UniProtKB/Swiss-Prot annotation:
Residues 1-33 form a propeptide. Disruption phenotype: Disruption of the gene results in the reduction of aprE expression. The keyword Secreted applies. The gene is phrG. This is RapG inhibitor. Belongs to the Phr family.
Amino acid sequence: MKRFLIGAGVAAVILSGWFIADHQTHSQEMKVAEKMIG
């Protein structure tokens, strides 16, 4: 059970980091698009 919890914790950290990185790149693309349109 402990091993499962550790694995779940590691997976959660990796997923949250991936979501944050994906959101940051997306917001940067939106800023570039706004500059091009504006």
